[in-house]
Amino acid sequence: ASTKGPSVFPLAPSSKSTSGGTAALGCLVKDYFPEPVTVSWNSGALTSGVHTFPAVLQSSGLYSLSSVVTVPSSSLGTQTYICNVNHKPSNTKVDKKVEPKSCDKTHTCPPCPAPELLGGPSVFLFPPKPKDTLMISRTPEVTCVVVDVSHEDPEVKFNWYVDGVEVHNAKTKPREEQYNSTYRVVSVLTVLHQDWLNGKEYKCKVSNKALPAPIEKTISKAKGQPREPQVYTLPPSRDELTKNQVSLTCLVKGFYPSDIAVEWESNGQPENNYKTTPPVLDSDGSFFLYSKLTVDKSRWQQGNVFSCSVMHEALHNHYTQKSLSLSPELQLEESCAEAQDGELDGLWTTITIFITLFLLSVCYSATVTFFKVKWIFSSVVDLKQTIIPDYRNMIGQGA
Protein backbone atom coordinates (compact mmCIF):
# COMPACT_ATOMS: atom_id res chain seq x y z
CA ALA A 1 0.00 0.00 0.00
CA SER A 2 1.12 3.54 -0.70
CA THR A 3 1.50 6.20 1.98
CA LYS A 4 -1.89 7.41 3.21
CA GLY A 5 -2.84 9.86 5.93
CA PRO A 6 -5.38 8.88 8.61
CA SER A 7 -9.00 9.85 9.03
CA VAL A 8 -9.77 10.95 12.60
CA PHE A 9 -13.14 10.59 14.32
CA PRO A 10 -13.99 11.88 17.82
CA LEU A 11 -15.70 9.39 20.16
CA ALA A 12 -17.72 10.91 22.98
CA PRO A 13 -20.59 9.84 25.24
CA SER A 14 -23.86 11.73 25.34
CA SER A 15 -24.13 14.38 28.02
CA LYS A 16 -26.80 12.21 29.69
CA SER A 17 -24.32 9.37 30.24
CA THR A 18 -21.64 11.47 31.93
CA SER A 19 -23.41 11.98 35.25
CA GLY A 20 -20.97 9.74 37.15
CA GLY A 21 -17.59 10.68 38.56
CA THR A 22 -15.66 10.23 35.31
CA ALA A 23 -16.26 10.20 31.57
CA ALA A 24 -14.32 8.48 28.78
CA LEU A 25 -13.50 10.44 25.63
CA GLY A 26 -12.02 8.69 22.63
CA CYS A 27 -10.36 9.28 19.28
CA LEU A 28 -10.47 6.78 16.37
CA VAL A 29 -7.54 7.03 13.93
CA LYS A 30 -8.44 5.05 10.83
CA ASP A 31 -7.10 3.96 7.43
CA TYR A 32 -3.47 5.10 7.47
CA PHE A 33 -0.22 3.61 6.15
CA PRO A 34 2.49 3.03 7.13
CA GLU A 35 3.10 2.90 10.86
CA PRO A 36 3.58 4.76 13.17
CA VAL A 37 1.07 7.40 14.17
CA THR A 38 1.28 9.36 17.44
CA VAL A 39 -1.73 10.52 19.45
CA SER A 40 -1.65 13.12 22.23
CA TRP A 41 -4.30 15.07 24.08
CA ASN A 42 -4.38 18.85 24.42
CA SER A 43 -1.02 19.12 22.63
CA GLY A 44 0.61 16.91 25.29
CA ALA A 45 -0.68 18.93 28.25
CA LEU A 46 -3.00 16.07 29.22
CA THR A 47 -1.18 12.82 30.05
CA SER A 48 -3.01 11.43 33.07
CA GLY A 49 -5.70 8.89 32.28
CA VAL A 50 -4.61 8.49 28.63
CA HIS A 51 -4.47 5.01 27.08
CA THR A 52 -3.60 4.54 23.40
CA PHE A 53 -4.27 1.03 22.10
CA PRO A 54 -1.91 -0.81 19.72
CA ALA A 55 -2.50 -0.37 16.00
CA VAL A 56 -4.50 -3.03 14.14
CA LEU A 57 -3.77 -4.05 10.53
CA GLN A 58 -7.05 -4.23 8.60
CA SER A 59 -7.84 -6.51 5.67
CA SER A 60 -7.46 -3.48 3.39
CA GLY A 61 -3.77 -3.28 4.32
CA LEU A 62 -4.31 -0.04 6.24
CA TYR A 63 -3.87 0.52 9.97
CA SER A 64 -6.28 1.77 12.63
CA LEU A 65 -5.95 2.55 16.33
CA SER A 66 -7.85 4.32 19.08
CA SER A 67 -6.92 6.46 22.06
CA VAL A 68 -9.03 6.99 25.18
CA VAL A 69 -8.73 9.53 28.00
CA THR A 70 -10.68 9.36 31.27
CA VAL A 71 -11.58 12.78 32.70
CA PRO A 72 -13.74 14.09 35.55
CA SER A 73 -17.34 14.51 34.39
CA SER A 74 -17.45 17.88 36.12
CA SER A 75 -14.75 19.22 33.76
CA LEU A 76 -16.66 18.58 30.53
CA GLY A 77 -18.52 21.86 30.64
CA THR A 78 -15.51 23.99 31.55
CA GLN A 79 -12.50 22.41 29.86
CA THR A 80 -11.72 21.62 26.22
CA TYR A 81 -10.34 18.26 25.12
CA ILE A 82 -8.50 17.99 21.80
CA CYS A 83 -7.17 14.79 20.23
CA ASN A 84 -3.90 15.57 18.38
CA VAL A 85 -2.89 13.07 15.68
CA ASN A 86 0.47 13.16 13.90
CA HIS A 87 1.32 10.82 11.00
CA LYS A 88 4.85 11.72 9.93
CA PRO A 89 5.09 9.42 6.85
CA SER A 90 2.26 11.38 5.18
CA ASN A 91 3.08 14.68 6.92
CA THR A 92 -0.45 14.70 8.35
CA LYS A 93 -1.48 16.50 11.55
CA VAL A 94 -5.09 16.52 12.73
CA ASP A 95 -6.70 18.14 15.78
CA LYS A 96 -10.19 17.01 16.76
CA LYS A 97 -12.26 18.48 19.55
CA VAL A 98 -13.98 15.75 21.58
CA GLU A 99 -17.02 16.70 23.64
CA PRO A 100 -20.23 15.02 24.85
CA LYS A 101 -23.14 15.08 22.46
CA SER A 102 -25.58 17.67 23.70
CA CYS A 103 -28.63 16.30 21.89
CA ASP A 104 -30.30 12.89 22.06
CA LYS A 105 -32.67 11.50 19.43
CA THR A 106 -34.91 9.99 22.11
CA HIS A 107 -35.28 13.25 24.02
CA THR A 108 -36.51 16.70 23.12
CA CYS A 109 -33.60 19.13 23.26
CA PRO A 110 -33.50 22.89 22.92
CA PRO A 111 -31.89 24.11 19.69
CA CYS A 112 -28.14 23.65 19.76
CA PRO A 113 -26.24 26.97 19.69
CA ALA A 114 -24.81 27.97 16.35
CA PRO A 115 -21.05 27.58 15.96
CA GLU A 116 -18.89 30.65 15.81
CA LEU A 117 -18.66 30.21 12.07
CA LEU A 118 -19.62 27.08 10.20
CA GLY A 119 -16.59 25.86 8.29
CA GLY A 120 -14.36 28.68 9.55
CA PRO A 121 -11.44 28.68 12.00
CA SER A 122 -11.94 27.33 15.53
CA VAL A 123 -10.00 28.49 18.60
CA PHE A 124 -8.95 26.46 21.65
CA LEU A 125 -7.15 27.70 24.76
CA PHE A 126 -5.15 25.35 27.00
CA PRO A 127 -3.81 25.91 30.55
CA PRO A 128 -0.18 25.30 31.55
CA LYS A 129 0.84 21.87 32.82
CA PRO A 130 0.48 21.62 36.63
CA LYS A 131 4.14 20.67 37.06
CA ASP A 132 5.25 23.75 35.12
CA THR A 133 3.30 26.10 37.40
CA LEU A 134 4.61 24.46 40.60
CA MET A 135 8.35 24.23 39.86
CA ILE A 136 10.31 27.48 39.64
CA SER A 137 12.81 25.81 37.30
CA ARG A 138 10.11 25.20 34.69
CA THR A 139 8.27 27.61 32.41
CA PRO A 140 4.46 27.63 32.48
CA GLU A 141 2.73 28.44 29.20
CA VAL A 142 -0.83 29.14 28.10
CA THR A 143 -1.41 27.83 24.57
CA CYS A 144 -3.86 29.21 22.01
CA VAL A 145 -4.55 26.88 19.05
CA VAL A 146 -6.39 27.90 15.86
CA VAL A 147 -7.46 25.15 13.45
CA ASP A 148 -9.21 25.05 10.07
CA VAL A 149 -7.44 28.15 8.76
CA SER A 150 -7.99 28.31 4.99
CA HIS A 151 -5.37 28.78 2.26
CA GLU A 152 -7.34 31.76 0.98
CA ASP A 153 -7.04 33.58 4.33
CA PRO A 154 -3.95 32.12 6.03
CA GLU A 155 -2.98 35.14 8.14
CA VAL A 156 -3.94 34.85 11.81
CA LYS A 157 -3.44 37.64 14.33
CA PHE A 158 -3.18 36.96 18.06
CA ASN A 159 -3.77 39.48 20.85
CA TRP A 160 -3.12 38.42 24.45
CA TYR A 161 -4.48 39.99 27.64
CA VAL A 162 -3.73 39.36 31.32
CA ASP A 163 -6.54 40.60 33.56
CA GLY A 164 -7.67 42.84 30.71
CA VAL A 165 -4.24 44.38 30.07
CA GLU A 166 -2.67 43.59 26.70
CA VAL A 167 0.75 41.90 26.76
CA HIS A 168 3.20 41.42 23.89
CA ASN A 169 5.52 38.59 24.95
CA ALA A 170 3.65 35.74 23.21
CA LYS A 171 5.35 33.70 20.49
CA THR A 172 3.48 32.51 17.41
CA LYS A 173 4.80 29.34 15.81
CA PRO A 174 4.97 28.80 12.03
CA ARG A 175 1.65 27.57 10.70
CA GLU A 176 1.37 23.85 9.98
CA GLU A 177 -0.52 22.45 7.00
CA GLN A 178 -3.09 19.76 7.79
CA TYR A 179 -4.28 16.79 5.76
CA ASN A 180 -7.54 18.59 4.82
CA SER A 181 -5.66 21.49 3.16
CA THR A 182 -6.10 23.84 6.11
CA TYR A 183 -3.58 25.34 8.50
CA ARG A 184 -3.05 24.97 12.22
CA VAL A 185 -1.58 28.00 13.98
CA VAL A 186 -0.34 28.05 17.59
CA SER A 187 0.53 30.98 19.84
CA VAL A 188 2.19 30.44 23.23
CA LEU A 189 2.19 32.92 26.10
CA THR A 190 4.75 32.44 28.87
CA VAL A 191 3.16 33.27 32.23
CA LEU A 192 4.52 33.94 35.69
CA HIS A 193 4.09 31.14 38.22
CA GLN A 194 2.46 33.36 40.85
CA ASP A 195 0.22 35.10 38.33
CA TRP A 196 -1.34 31.78 37.37
CA LEU A 197 -1.55 30.51 40.96
CA ASN A 198 -3.10 33.80 42.09
CA GLY A 199 -5.94 33.33 39.62
CA LYS A 200 -5.16 35.93 36.96
CA GLU A 201 -7.29 35.63 33.82
CA TYR A 202 -5.69 35.08 30.41
CA LYS A 203 -7.47 35.96 27.18
CA CYS A 204 -6.50 35.03 23.63
CA LYS A 205 -8.12 37.12 20.89
CA VAL A 206 -7.90 35.69 17.36
CA SER A 207 -8.49 37.70 14.19
CA ASN A 208 -8.75 36.28 10.67
CA LYS A 209 -10.39 37.52 7.44
CA ALA A 210 -12.61 34.43 7.37
CA LEU A 211 -14.14 35.47 10.70
CA PRO A 212 -16.93 38.06 10.82
CA ALA A 213 -15.57 39.14 14.22
CA PRO A 214 -12.55 38.19 16.35
CA ILE A 215 -12.91 35.10 18.56
CA GLU A 216 -11.98 35.52 22.24
CA LYS A 217 -11.19 32.70 24.65
CA THR A 218 -10.37 33.12 28.36
CA ILE A 219 -8.86 30.79 30.92
CA SER A 220 -7.73 30.90 34.55
CA LYS A 221 -7.01 28.62 37.47
CA ALA A 222 -10.08 27.08 39.12
CA LYS A 223 -11.47 29.41 41.77
CA GLY A 224 -11.80 28.36 45.40
CA GLN A 225 -9.71 27.85 48.54
CA PRO A 226 -6.76 25.48 47.89
CA ARG A 227 -6.75 22.33 50.02
CA GLU A 228 -3.60 20.39 50.86
CA PRO A 229 -3.43 16.80 49.60
CA GLN A 230 -2.94 13.89 51.99
CA VAL A 231 -0.56 11.25 50.66
CA TYR A 232 -0.52 7.57 51.66
CA THR A 233 1.65 4.77 50.26
CA LEU A 234 0.55 1.13 50.26
CA PRO A 235 2.83 -1.94 49.87
CA PRO A 236 2.01 -4.90 47.61
CA SER A 237 -0.75 -7.26 48.66
CA ARG A 238 0.41 -10.53 50.20
CA ASP A 239 -1.45 -12.43 47.47
CA GLU A 240 0.47 -10.50 44.78
CA LEU A 241 3.85 -11.64 46.14
CA THR A 242 3.39 -14.96 44.34
CA LYS A 243 3.84 -13.14 41.01
CA ASN A 244 6.98 -11.86 39.26
CA GLN A 245 5.85 -8.22 39.47
CA VAL A 246 4.21 -6.33 42.31
CA SER A 247 2.25 -3.08 42.62
CA LEU A 248 3.08 -0.14 44.88
CA THR A 249 0.18 2.26 45.38
CA CYS A 250 0.04 5.96 46.21
CA LEU A 251 -3.29 7.40 47.38
CA VAL A 252 -3.58 11.19 47.14
CA LYS A 253 -6.79 12.63 48.59
CA GLY A 254 -8.45 15.77 49.89
CA PHE A 255 -6.85 18.24 47.45
CA TYR A 256 -8.25 21.25 45.59
CA PRO A 257 -8.03 22.39 42.85
CA SER A 258 -7.56 19.33 40.65
CA ASP A 259 -4.27 20.60 39.13
CA ILE A 260 -1.70 18.14 40.49
CA ALA A 261 1.38 16.18 39.38
CA VAL A 262 2.39 12.74 40.67
CA GLU A 263 5.67 10.97 39.89
CA TRP A 264 7.66 7.98 41.20
CA GLU A 265 11.37 7.54 41.80
CA SER A 266 13.77 5.02 43.34
CA ASN A 267 17.18 5.79 44.79
CA GLY A 268 17.06 9.24 43.20
CA GLN A 269 16.26 7.91 39.72
CA PRO A 270 12.85 8.37 38.04
CA GLU A 271 10.56 5.37 37.66
CA ASN A 272 8.47 5.34 34.48
CA ASN A 273 6.34 2.20 34.77
CA TYR A 274 3.41 3.81 36.56
CA LYS A 275 -0.17 4.80 35.84
CA THR A 276 -2.11 7.59 37.54
CA THR A 277 -5.87 7.97 37.51
CA PRO A 278 -7.41 11.35 36.68
CA PRO A 279 -8.48 13.38 39.72
CA VAL A 280 -11.93 12.26 40.88
CA LEU A 281 -14.36 14.65 42.58
CA ASP A 282 -15.14 13.47 46.13
CA SER A 283 -18.34 14.06 48.11
CA ASP A 284 -16.76 16.93 50.10
CA GLY A 285 -15.82 18.90 46.98
CA SER A 286 -12.15 17.88 47.07
CA PHE A 287 -10.40 15.51 44.67
CA PHE A 288 -8.58 12.19 45.04
CA LEU A 289 -6.54 9.91 42.79
CA TYR A 290 -4.49 6.72 42.81
CA SER A 291 -1.08 6.14 41.27
CA LYS A 292 0.24 2.58 40.76
CA LEU A 293 3.90 1.73 40.21
CA THR A 294 4.73 -1.73 38.87
CA VAL A 295 8.17 -3.17 39.74
CA ASP A 296 9.89 -6.55 39.67
CA LYS A 297 9.31 -8.49 42.87
CA SER A 298 13.06 -9.01 43.27
CA ARG A 299 13.63 -5.23 43.47
CA TRP A 300 11.01 -4.93 46.19
CA GLN A 301 12.40 -7.86 48.18
CA GLN A 302 15.94 -6.43 47.95
CA GLY A 303 14.80 -3.48 50.07
CA ASN A 304 14.94 -0.75 47.42
CA VAL A 305 13.25 2.50 48.49
CA PHE A 306 10.47 3.76 46.21
CA SER A 307 9.09 7.29 46.58
CA CYS A 308 5.80 8.83 45.48
CA SER A 309 6.32 12.54 44.75
CA VAL A 310 3.33 14.89 44.74
CA MET A 311 3.25 18.50 43.51
CA HIS A 312 0.32 20.75 44.40
CA GLU A 313 -0.07 24.46 45.13
CA ALA A 314 -1.45 23.90 48.65
CA LEU A 315 1.67 21.99 49.80
CA HIS A 316 4.59 23.65 51.58
CA ASN A 317 7.04 24.49 48.79
CA HIS A 318 4.44 22.91 46.47
CA TYR A 319 6.02 19.49 47.05
CA THR A 320 5.87 16.43 49.27
CA GLN A 321 7.21 12.90 49.04
CA LYS A 322 6.29 9.62 50.71
CA SER A 323 8.67 6.66 50.60
CA LEU A 324 7.95 2.96 50.68
CA SER A 325 10.23 -0.05 51.12
CA LEU A 326 10.22 -3.58 52.49
CA SER A 327 10.56 -2.79 56.21
CA PRO A 328 11.72 -5.41 58.77
CA GLU A 329 8.12 -5.70 59.96
CA LEU A 330 6.86 -6.39 56.44
CA GLN A 331 9.78 -8.73 55.81
CA LEU A 332 9.01 -10.61 59.04
CA GLU A 333 5.36 -10.80 58.08
CA GLU A 334 6.24 -12.20 54.65
CA SER A 335 8.69 -14.67 56.23
CA CYS A 336 6.08 -15.75 58.76
CA ALA A 337 3.55 -16.15 55.99
CA GLU A 338 5.99 -18.30 54.01
CA ALA A 339 6.86 -20.27 57.16
CA GLN A 340 3.17 -20.81 57.91
CA ASP A 341 2.63 -22.01 54.37
CA GLY A 342 5.60 -24.37 54.77
CA GLU A 343 4.32 -25.63 58.11
CA LEU A 344 0.88 -26.23 56.65
CA ASP A 345 2.42 -28.13 53.73
CA GLY A 346 4.44 -30.25 56.19
CA LEU A 347 1.41 -30.82 58.40
CA TRP A 348 -0.70 -31.99 55.49
CA THR A 349 2.09 -34.35 54.40
CA THR A 350 2.26 -35.83 57.92
CA ILE A 351 -1.52 -36.19 58.11
CA THR A 352 -1.60 -37.89 54.70
CA ILE A 353 1.13 -40.38 55.70
CA PHE A 354 -0.61 -41.08 59.03
CA ILE A 355 -3.97 -41.73 57.34
CA THR A 356 -2.33 -44.01 54.77
CA LEU A 357 -0.50 -46.03 57.43
CA PHE A 358 -3.63 -46.20 59.57
CA LEU A 359 -5.69 -47.56 56.68
CA LEU A 360 -2.97 -50.10 55.85
CA SER A 361 -2.86 -51.16 59.51
CA VAL A 362 -6.64 -51.57 59.63
CA CYS A 363 -6.64 -53.59 56.40
CA TYR A 364 -3.81 -55.81 57.69
CA SER A 365 -5.51 -56.39 61.04
CA ALA A 366 -8.81 -57.19 59.36
CA THR A 367 -7.14 -59.67 57.02
CA VAL A 368 -5.25 -61.43 59.83
CA THR A 369 -8.38 -61.59 61.99
CA PHE A 370 -10.37 -63.01 59.10
CA PHE A 371 -7.90 -65.87 58.55
CA LYS A 372 -7.64 -66.57 62.29
CA VAL A 373 -11.41 -66.82 62.64
CA LYS A 374 -11.64 -69.01 59.57
CA TRP A 375 -8.94 -71.37 60.96
CA ILE A 376 -10.57 -71.61 64.39
CA PHE A 377 -13.98 -72.24 62.85
CA SER A 378 -12.55 -75.03 60.66
CA SER A 379 -10.80 -76.63 63.68
CA VAL A 380 -13.99 -76.59 65.74
CA VAL A 381 -15.99 -78.24 62.94
CA ASP A 382 -13.38 -80.97 62.50
CA LEU A 383 -13.23 -81.62 66.25
CA LYS A 384 -17.00 -81.80 66.48
CA GLN A 385 -17.17 -84.39 63.71
CA THR A 386 -14.58 -86.55 65.54
CA ILE A 387 -16.21 -86.38 69.00
CA ILE A 388 -19.84 -87.12 68.02
CA PRO A 389 -19.26 -90.77 66.78
CA ASP A 390 -17.26 -91.65 69.93
CA TYR A 391 -20.00 -90.31 72.10
CA ARG A 392 -22.58 -92.50 70.32
CA ASN A 393 -20.39 -95.62 70.77
CA MET A 394 -20.17 -94.95 74.46
CA ILE A 395 -23.96 -94.79 74.69
CA GLY A 396 -24.26 -98.11 72.83
CA GLN A 397 -21.85 -99.89 75.18
CA GLY A 398 -23.68 -98.64 78.25
CA ALA A 399 -26.94 -100.06 77.00
Curated annotation (Swiss-Prot):
Disulfide bonds join 27-83, 144-204, 250-308. The chain crosses the membrane at residues 351-371. Glycosylation on Asn-180 is required for interaction with Fc receptors and ability to activate the complement pathway. (Microbial infection) Deglycosylation on Asn-180 by S.pyogenes EndoS or Endos2 endoglucosidases prevents interaction between immunoglobulin-gamma (IgG) and Fc receptors, impairing ability to activate the complement pathway. Residues 1-21 are annotated as: Disordered. Residues 1-350 are extracellular. Changing residue 120 to A: Reduces the affinity for FCGR1A about 40-fold. Abolishes binding to FCGR2A and FCGR3A. Impairs ADCC of virus-infected cells by monocytes. Decreases binding to complement component C1q. Decreases complement-dependent cytotoxicity. Changing residue 117 to A: Reduces the affinity for FCGR1A about 5-fold. Abolishes binding to FCGR2A and FCGR3A. Impairs ADCC of virus-infected cells by monocytes. Impairs binding to complement component C1q. Impairs complement-dependent cytotoxicity. Residues 224-330 are annotated as: CH3. Residues 1-98 are annotated as: CH1. CDD domains: IgC1_CH1_IgEG (cd21817), IgC1_CH3_IgAGD_CH4_IgAEM (cd05768). It comes from the Eukaryota. One of its GO terms (cellular component) is blood microparticle. Keywords: Adaptive immunity, Cell membrane, Chromosomal rearrangement, Disulfide bond, Glycoprotein, Immunity, Immunoglobulin, Immunoglobulin domain, Membrane, Secreted, Transmembrane, Transmembrane helix. PANTHER family: TAPASIN (PTHR23411). It comes from Homo sapiens. InterPro entries: Ig-like_dom (IPR007110), Ig-like_dom_sf (IPR036179), Ig-like_fold (IPR013783), Ig/MHC_CS (IPR003006), Ig_C1-set (IPR003597), Immune_Resp_Modulators (IPR050380). Residues 372-399 are cytoplasmic. Changing residue 118 to E: Reduces the affinity for FCGR1A about 40-fold. Abolishes binding to FCGR2A and FCGR3A. Impairs ADCC of virus-infected cells by monocytes. Impairs binding to complement component C1q. Impairs complement-dependent cytotoxicity. One of its GO terms (molecular function) is Fc-gamma receptor I complex binding. Residues 6-99, 121-220, 229-325 form the Ig-like domain. It holds the Pfam family C1-set. Immunoglobulins are composed of two identical heavy chains and two identical light chains; disulfide-linked. Interacts with FCGR1A; this interaction mediates IgG effector functions on monocytes. Interacts with FCGR2A and FCGR3A. Residues 99-110 are annotated as: Hinge. This is Immunoglobulin heavy constant gamma 1. Glycans are attached at residue 180. GO terms for biological process: adaptive immune response; antibacterial humoral response; antibody-dependent cellular cytotoxicity; B cell receptor signaling pathway; complement activation, classical pathway; complement-dependent cytotoxicity. The gene is IGHG1.
